[in-house]
């Protein structure tokens, strides 16, 4: 299993826990609940030491979107 496949499997576990799919996490839809779960996936990848650019590649998002998500999480967690 490649590192990307391992990360997608972990993203899938988080997504499934909330009733979503990996495709939902990698897609462009922005339902409030989906965005919150996507941010949890981003936080998990960041905790594993990935850069914002690497997370962007994994999540099919621009790195600036990843930076914004991490800033929102930091603000929420004080």
Residue ranges and their predicted role:
Residues 47, 60, 71-75:
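Residue-level detection of the helix-turn-helix DNA-binding "recognition helix"
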Residues 1-14:
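General nucleic-acid-binding
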Residues 34-50:
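Short, amphipathic alpha-helical "recognition" segments used to contact nucleic acids or chromatin
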Residues 44, 57, 68:
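DNA-binding alpha-helical recognition surfaces that contact promoter or target DNA
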Residues 53-59:
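Short alpha-helical "recognition helix" segments of helix-turn-helix
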